[in-house]
């Protein structure tokens, strides 16, 4: 049985999500789907000029997973450019839903993806953790278990 795919952390969303070669009508063109996390991987590596380890850390994936994501992204972009295909940026397995938690036992403050991660302190393993609600994403999820 395969492990579930971890959400990739994404900080940037483009205003434009569809690119077509000049002079070709949309209705007569093949398109390639570039995942949101693939665009993020290229942005971190090629525009922000971070090294692989820094990119992987920002996206909260392993270095190998980051390399797989960016390899896939670059192949798609090069294929679209050389074969005159459109690029649609959509889909993927990503999140921006991060929330800061604080452990009541050891007072460690850390971020979690509340769609995926369990609310257990990564430092001491305690389940006595609370959302500080400052991120604003999880107001409905926390339901009063907050610290101010």
UniProtKB/Swiss-Prot annotation:
InterPro entries to which the protein is assigned, alphabetical: RNA_pol_sigma_r3/r4-like (IPR013324), UPF0251 (IPR002852)
PANTHER family in the record: PTHR37478, UPF0251 PROTEIN TK0562
Protein name: UPF0251 protein Cbei_2962
Pfam families, sorted: DUF134
Transmembrane segments: none
Superkingdom assignment: Bacteria
Homology family: Belongs to the UPF0251 family.
Taxonomic classification: Bacteria, Bacillati, Bacillota, Clostridia, Eubacteriales
């Amino acid at each position: 049985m395969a492990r579930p795919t971890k959400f990739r952390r994404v900080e940037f969303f483009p205003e434009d999500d569809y690119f077509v070669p000049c002079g070709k009508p949309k209705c007569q063109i093949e398109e390639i789907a570039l995942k949101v996390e693939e665009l993020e991987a290229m942005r971190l590596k090629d525009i922000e000029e971070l090294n692989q380890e820094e990119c992987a850390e920002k996206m909260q994936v392993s270095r190998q997973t980051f390399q797989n994501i960016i390899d896939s992204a670059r192949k798609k972009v090069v294929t679209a450019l050389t074969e005159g295909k459109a690029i649609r940026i959509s889909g993927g397995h990503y999140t921006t839903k991060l929330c800061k938690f604080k452990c009541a036992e050891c007072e460690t403050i850390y971020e979690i993806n509340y769609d995926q991660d369990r609310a257990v302190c990564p430092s001491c393993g305690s389940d006595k953790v609370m959302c500080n609600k400052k991120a604003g994403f999880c107001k409905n999820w926390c339901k009063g278990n907050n610290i101010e």
